[in-house]
């Protein structure tokens, strides 16, 4: 139960941070391109790599800190960072084909799922 509360608290913090960063980017770059989403995905991916290495290998942080920061805060900030970390882990462990398949499947199937959801709702309305 403690971990669930930590994930929830971290997720709330990460979601608010994502919203604020999105607004900040929108004010600076305008609405013509999704700069906020790109910025969040790239910075979230950097942070998950940095924190995973720092927390797990340099700091020896508690499972609670890992759950709060990585699953909670960064999970609320961007799930693209988790996808990126999983893909890199597969590639670093020599599972090149699995890693590439995971990347292609994640992006391709997610795009198809969004398209299917849009099409279904448009057909219902």
Swiss-Prot record:
Na(+) is not transported, but it plays an essential structural role and its presence is essential for fluoride channel function. It catalyses: fluoride(in) = fluoride(out). Na(+) binds at residues 75, 78. InterPro entries: FluC. It holds the Pfam family CRCB. One of its GO terms (cellular component) is plasma membrane. GO terms for molecular function: fluoride channel activity; metal ion binding. One of its GO terms (biological process) is cellular detoxification of fluoride. Keywords: Cell inner membrane, Cell membrane, Ion channel, Ion transport, Membrane, Metal-binding, Sodium, Transmembrane, Transmembrane helix, Transport. The chain crosses the membrane at residues 4-24, 32-52, 68-88, 100-120. The keyword Metal-binding applies. It is found in: Cell inner membrane. Belongs to the fluoride channel Fluc/FEX (TC 1.A.43) family. HAMAP family: FluC. Fluoride-specific ion channel. Important for reducing fluoride concentration in the cell, thus reducing its toxicity. This is Fluoride-specific ion channel FluC.
